[in-house]
Swiss-Prot record:
Function: Binds directly to 23S ribosomal RNA and is necessary for the in vitro assembly process of the 50S ribosomal subunit. It is not involved in the protein synthesizing functions of that subunit.
Keywords noted in UniProt: Ribonucleoprotein, Ribosomal protein, RNA-binding, rRNA-binding
Family named by the database record: Belongs to the bacterial ribosomal protein bL20 family.
InterPro entries assigned: Ribosomal_bL20, RIBOSOMAL_L20_CS, Ribosomal_protein_bL20_C
Pfam families xrefs: Ribosomal_L20
Protein name, as recorded: Large ribosomal subunit protein bL20
Keyword Hydrolase attached: no
Gene Ontology cellular component list: ribonucleoprotein complex; ribosome
Molecular function as annotated in GO: rRNA binding; structural constituent of ribosome
BP terms from Gene Ontology: ribosomal large subunit assembly; translation
């Protein structure tokens, strides 16, 4: 049976990892072992933070809606409850966009919520 030499395969595998580690700081883009560890961590961070990003944006939208609602004399929870009572289905992303870019439209929604709350 012939002896198998894995030089080509090993070199290809190492090159692939080092290519993924391009731009990393210090030894992490030069040494194979540290590069491999960092690439594995990077995949983990990417996976985790794709989920975290959704939570972060929701927090940002709620903060913006709350700030705009308080300018109209409501708290965030009162505004959301009033909109639900008024059967106005607008998601938080759209509400936050209105709060930042179209204050008049947001005020109209806040007034509709106030009317349903009896304020």
């Amino acid at each position: 049976m012939a002896r198998v030499k894995g030089g080509v395969v090993s070199r290809k595998r190492r090159k692939r990892v080092l290519k993924l580690a391009k731009g990393y700081y210090g030894a992490k883009h030069i040494l194979f072992r540290t590069a491999k560890e960092q690439v594995m961590n990077s995949y983990y961070y990417a996976y985790r933070d794709r989920r975290q990003k959704k939570r972060d944006f929701r927090k940002l939208w709620i903060t913006r809606i709350n700030a705009a609602a308080r300018l109209n004399g409501l708290s965030y929870s009162q505004l959301m409850h009033g909109l639900k009572l008024a059967e106005i289905e607008v998601n938080r992303k759209m509400l936050a966009d209105l709060a930042v870019n179209d204050a008049a439209a947001f005020t109209a929604l806040a007034d509709a919520a106030k009317a349903k709350l009896g304020k």
